[in-house]
UniProtKB/Swiss-Prot annotation:
This is Putative defensin-like protein 28. One of its GO terms (biological process) is defense response to fungus. One of its GO terms (cellular component) is extracellular region. Keywords: Antimicrobial, Fungicide, Plant defense, Secreted, Signal. It comes from the Eukaryota. Residues 1-22 form the signal peptide. InterPro entries: Defensin-like_20-28 (IPR022618). It is found in: Secreted.
Length: 80
């Protein structure tokens, strides 16, 4: 029985690794530590800011607008 549990655990682990397909994070709300500290990743007024989507100047992203209008330090908060 223990051997079967180990095999099942390894199969699940391998399946998860395949789903990740080399990506750092498989969930968009978890941010990489390598990213620069940016303006309001999560803010009570605008919600979660998805990197590359909500901060995209070309698509007029909600977080980009908020950072320009409200945030200090030119849109970046060094405190976070």
């Amino acid at each position: 029985m223990l051997r079967a549990n180990v095999v099942v655990s390894l199969v699940i682990f391998a399946a998860l690794m395949q789903c990740m397909n080399g990506k750092e994070n498989i969930t968009p709300w978890i941010y990489s530590m390598k990213q620069p500290v940016s303006c309001n990743r999560e803010h009570s007024e605008i919600g979660i800011c998805l990197s590359g989507i909500d901060d995209d100047i070309q698509n007029d992203g909600k977080c980009w607008k908020f950072c320009l209008m409200v945030a200090k330090s030119g849109g970046y908060n060094a405190d976070k």
